[in-house]
Structures are given as structure tokens and as C-alpha cells.
Amino acid sequence: MKTNGHFKDFAWKKCLLGTSVVALLVGCSPHIIETNEVALKLNYHPASEKVQALDEKILLLKPAFQYSDNIAKEYENKFKNQTTLKVEEILQNQGYKVINVDSSDKDDFSFAQKKEGYLAVAMIGEIVLRPDPKRTIQKKSEPGLLFSTGLDKMEGVLIPAGFVKVTILEPMSGESLDSFTMDLSELDIQEKFLKTTHSSHSGGLVSTMVKGTDNSNDAIKSALNKIFASIMQEMDKKLTQRNLESYQKDAKELKNKRNR
């Protein structure tokens, strides 16, 4: 009887230990490895040849861009800053002196800027990256003590949407002389991605042996690099000295009219 009591006590403790181990393991969240193999470079070199310098100044407003929620704030800031730098480089390559305006609003031009600026360039737009609904699938982890991974996955293709509109202004009057718009959904940019997140439940025993991979951030950076290059390529084609000098007559009339 005494031996039997010891056996029952041992079995009970073993059961408790096993239950505790299971509870501990079930409570562990699986590890997610986020890849970082792509750099956000946002590079572009003007394709057109440098032309003869003119004694004319162009006011360059800061871009007023909005971004989709999946684009990190630091990426937004770099995209905006690089846009300003590269458009400035394109305009300088076309022979213009560039005055950077620390605002995206034409109403913030100083009188001196209005007076000395031949033209002004303003940019607005929406930079959107979204999963292609036709080529994206979602798989949610089912709750369970044993085989639940505790990981939800979205796998598919990231595509661009939104637009960028560039407006050419006469600074003194603030009147628009011309504009052109780029539809980002027309760009042939497709980035495969796998986004992995923790499920609302902690997962089962198998979750302790599972490692999830998430390369969605790399896909976003790669897509932004390509979007940026496409936007700058279009800017390079449109913001030529030949095109910008074609506004000279209208710009002069508007400036003189405002000065009367």
C-alpha cells in the first residue's frame, strides 16, 4: 500500500510537470525573421546632356506627397528629400539656377522669390503600395495545443498605385502655366512578398520549432527604388530647357500684369 502511494505521488508530480512544460511551450511565440537585404537607394542620374546655363532661376517647392500606411515614416522622408535633390539636379542640368523653397505651398513665396523666379515647380501626389488582390493569399493559423504555428501569413505581389502631379507656375501671380501627371498604377512594377505576423493566439507545441520569415519590408524598399527611378525619368523628359523656355511669353505677361 505504501509503495502504491509513492507510485501515485510520482505519477501525479510527473503529470503536473508535463502539464507545466506543455503550458510553457504553448505560451511561447514563434520567432519571425525580418529580412534586410535591400537598401533604399532612390538613385537617379539625369539621362539628358548638360546644356548651356541660363541666367534664370526656378523656384522649387517641397513635394507634398501622401503615402500608404505600409511605407515607414523614414522611407517617406527620404523619398521626399531625394525627390527634391534629384529634381534640382535635373533643372540644374538644364541650365537653371534653383532656389529651394522650404514649403510646398505657393502662397509662402517671399516677395523677393516671386520677383526673381522665372518659374516655379510644385509637386503633389500619392505614393501607394498595395498587394495585388488577384495574386495575394492569406493564411491564418488555427488555434491548437499541438500543431498550431501561431503565425499568420500573407503571400503575394506588391504593386504601385497613386499619382504624381507636377505643376509649372509663374511665381508672381501664382498662376499655373502647365502640368503633367504620372499614373503610378501604369508602372510595370511587381514585387513578390511574404508578410508574417503573430496570430491572436500563441500557437501550439510546434510553434516553438517554427521560424517565420517576413520579407515585406524589402519588397517595399525595392518597389520604392523602382517607382522613384520611373518618376525621375519622366521628370527628365518633361523638365527640359526647350519645354521650360516655351512658357517665357506667358510668364512675362503674367509677371508684368501683376506688377502693374
Curated annotation (Swiss-Prot):
Annotated signal peptide: 1-27
PTM info: The N-terminus is blocked.
Keyword Membrane appears in the UniProt entry: yes
UniProt keyword list: Cell outer membrane, Lipoprotein, Membrane, Palmitate, Signal
Alphabetical list of Pfam families matching this protein: NLBH
Membrane topology: Lipid-anchor
Main location: membrane
Protein name: Neuraminyllactose-binding hemagglutinin
Species name: Helicobacter pylori
Protein's gene: hpaA
